[in-house]
Amino acid sequence: MLAEIISIGDELLIGQVVNTNATFISKCLDEIGISTRRILTVSDKPDCIERQLADSLSHADLVLTTGGLGPTHDDITKKIIADFFGLGYEFNEEAFERCKALFARRGREMPASNRSQGEVIEGSVVLQNTRGTAPGMILQNLPNYEGKFVVIMPGVPYEMQEMMRVSVVPFFQPHSKHFIKHTSLMTAGIGESTLAEQIGEVKAFLPDGSTLAFLPHSVGVRLRVSSKGENFQAVQKEHAQVVDALKARIGGYLYATTDMPLEEHIGELLKSRGLSIATAESCTGGLIANRLTNIPGSSAYFYQGFVTYSNEAKIKALGVREETLAAHGAVSEETAQEMAAGCLEKTGSDIAISTTGIAGPGGGTEIKPVGMVCIGVATSAKLGSRSFAKTMIFWADRLLNKERFSEAALNLVRELLNAS
């Protein structure tokens, strides 16, 4: 079964609202083996909706729309779709009573205009809205469109998501004849082209039902492996074989087989070994500490974070020597090492990670260009009392450079833990 998603609303076209609905719907469909062919956004003008509905029905078995189901004059989706198929309305008492009850719970009288939300397209399967006032509908057995389905849902994400999970997915699950299995292979410290070369042999001999998608992020790549077929056990077996072959090829660049951010993986490593970490950041401005503490339970391993942006702060807070700054500059491996060593000494943590660099857009030189970062690491006796630094250079704007600096620092911690 092929699906197309039509998101309706001028607010989407002008960028006022981000279209999260289409992403959610396509994920839900994928989980039950329904492939999304296209995602389209159209204006809430009648001719735009009509043209797109006709076009989508000519290509897909299932068309899902969101938006335009409210009680105001510009909410016209229900009328346009009913007129398109030459269908009338019928009154759904349950939907109307739900709407009245919602206003009553809020201590408000229901406006007369909301009575229209009890009207549904005749012959439709009504999708009750447990979080709002507008019911959804599934249209089937449509004149001139035998075997086609149209799903109409509200545009409010909070309402649509519940309707999709509770009503739409269970309705269409029996209609799908395919099983789909996905695995995300999360890598760090490797670029897309290098990874493609490394797994080239596996890619060349992929079974017909399996595909690979390269999804690059800051300093690594998420490799999505997908397998599809009509026999559940065969899909599972084929998928496992492909994943195992890829894991063997990727080697130490692989850190997870689920959609897990690097900071979560590092948190698991630290927690499992009873280790703590502290940060001393200059160019990343606390981003590493922020990422580590975004993970629930991070208090078990995150000790403290310093943001020492100025040279004076590096000297006072971390004990970086003035002589080091004078001789090598703030952006140097020597300074990064002293920042990490000072952080380790002051916190007593097991690992200290530091960053000092040039995020841009200004401040770069021929020797120290924009995008250069020096990352320092210091460890306690538990990890061999090590102290070292590494220089890396990226090419991006200021915010993306900061993101890449933080990712590179976290990956250095990962490599350290894996080697210890």
Curated annotation (Swiss-Prot):
It comes from the Bacteria. InterPro entries: CinA, CinA-like_C, CinA_C, CinA_KH, Competence-induced_CinA, MoaB/Mog-like_dom_sf, MoaB/Mog_dom. Signal peptide: none annotated. Transmembrane segments: none annotated. NCBIfam families: cinA_nterm, molyb_syn, PncC_domain, PRK00549.1. Belongs to the CinA family. This is CinA-like protein.
